[in-house]
Amino acid sequence: MSNSAVSYKPIVNIENIVATVTLEQSLDLYAMERSIPNIEYDPDQFPGLIFRLEQPKVTALIFKSGKMVVTGAKSTEELIKAVKRIIKTLKKYGIKIVGKPKIQIQNIVASANLHVNVNLDKAAFLLENNMYEPEQFPGLIFRMDDPRVVLLIFSSGKMVITGAKREDEVSKAVKRIFDKLAELDCVKPIEEEEELEL
């Protein structure tokens, strides 16, 4: 079976989305700490207030400037839902919110499994923009320009993708690296017995 016949059947999972949320106002973190349950605020340790949601399982770091860093969402939809719940909770406890929050995704971290074995030595030799030092780290680090992401590629065909700003960039990057690795003859099918061990 030639590598051109290796089928593309990845599994891609979004693991974490980190976003900034901007409110066009300053916030009184002391008042929020006093009125909203289950909030952590210790300005001697950290300048932001820590607000954890259980559903979806997201953490927000809220700063007095009105900026928030929201982390833990597994999709853009879940991120928006979490921000709406945070704003609703703030309003419920008497915190006046002016205008709509501005949400900007800073980083999407995803994992993928190509279901092929990857010859990393060959890939390191043939791919540009990569770093591979197996004595230091077992994965090949590949910097992709379009979309602008970093992929950690392992010989098992598993990978971690960081730096995406949109979910579709993750799928695009995984497809693009698979096609490039197949074109360079760096992938081979996993044998039936190997797949059963997973």
Swiss-Prot record:
InterPro entries: TBP (IPR000814), TBP_archaea (IPR033711), TBP_CS (IPR030491), TBP_dom_sf (IPR012295). Signal peptide: none annotated. Sequence repeats lie at residues 14-90, 105-181. It holds the Pfam family TBP. One of its GO terms (molecular function) is DNA binding. One of its GO terms (biological process) is DNA-templated transcription initiation. Keywords: DNA-binding, Repeat, Transcription, Transcription regulation. PROSITE patterns: TFIID. Belongs to the TBP family. HAMAP family: TATA_bind_prot_arch. General factor that plays a role in the activation of archaeal genes transcribed by RNA polymerase. Binds specifically to the TATA box promoter element which lies close to the position of transcription initiation. This is TATA-box-binding protein. It comes from Saccharolobus solfataricus (strain ATCC 35092 / DSM 1617 / JCM 11322 / P2) (Sulfolobus solfataricus).
